[in-house]
């Protein structure tokens, strides 16, 4: 459960949130709407632990996974399919542990990492990411192209696919 009590959040001299109080139960779906600059992105950054409070209390369970769509348009040479798979940070952490175990030639750590990789859905990640991209209007023949090669609208859809790839509560 997420609890905000009398939260005050500022960006510069202007208050974005003042005396905000809300409880969000596990499994509850919440939409965040408001005008530009009213603090929607800042509130999400607060919930992800990326911003500090200016006042009040914010309780977010440590194990909670929150997915959100980045507003910034990615402009990199990384393939769009990899950008989407990056949304599953647990899977990427598992891949990193596997690579480290291979570099150390640690067979036990490799076996543990491979077991975790399977549990994380690593063997199906690429096909799941491709299905998300296909469903959002991408030409599946182009999913290995750099994300920078796509229009702004398609790059925003890639951000949506990345958020959908993230296992979240």
Stretches with model-predicted labels:
Residues 1-169:
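ABC ATP-binding cassette signature C-motif
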